[in-house]
UniProtKB/Swiss-Prot annotation:
Entry's Gene Ontology molecular function annotations: ATP binding; magnesium ion binding; shikimate kinase activity
Location relative to the cell: Cytoplasm
Pathway: Metabolic intermediate biosynthesis; chorismate biosynthesis; chorismate from D-erythrose 4-phosphate and phosphoenolpyruvate: step 5/7
Complex formation: Monomer.
Residues annotated to bind Mg(2+): 19
Gene name, Swiss-Prot/TrEMBL: aroK
Keywords, comma-separated and alphabetical: Amino-acid biosynthesis, Aromatic amino acid biosynthesis, ATP-binding, Cytoplasm, Kinase, Magnesium, Metal-binding, Nucleotide-binding, Transferase
Cofactor: Mg(2+)
Protein name, as recorded: Shikimate kinase
Superkingdom of origin organism: Bacteria
Ligand binding (substrate): 37, 61, 82, 138
Organism: Staphylococcus aureus (strain MSSA476)
Catalytic activity: shikimate + ATP = 3-phosphoshikimate + ADP + H(+)
EC number: 2.7.1.71
Amino acid sequence: MNHDKSPIILIGFMGTGKSTIGKYVADEQNLSFIDIDSYIEEKYKLTIPEIFSKHGEQYFRNLEFTCLQECINTADIIATGGGIIESEEAFNFLKNQKNIIWLDCNIDIIYSRINDDPHRPNANNKTIKQLNDLYCSRNLRYNEIAFKKFDSHLLSISEIYYELLNLIKASDQY
């Protein structure tokens, strides 16, 4: 990556396809990709649920922000965790970045993807109404910092890929 360039940063609720699409675009374009959740798990040798359980959500949010700062100049594409905007520091940091792409999805589809997923501590044992409340509370923040929004339930991975490719070419960064 040219370190004078800004990475594409994927934001959005859990289960919207940030990791899948980020990896797909990176593979297709031979770009570097970092999934912040995976980066945290590898660096700290704990799963996200273990971090939540042992240290709490606020501790995890601090790690998430620290890792985002570490990765911002080393990756072409970054997939953030869905709750990264819960940290005021991370939110303000992201507000000052370029190329923030918000992946959104219908809550019913999200629920079917993440219901009972043991790797998602903020989704475990939640009803669809509880998950929808969390989803709605985060959407305003995603909207505030997003450069572009894609509805991942309306577009295929390849359609999102081509849209992102057009953005990459338009920014003439890669």
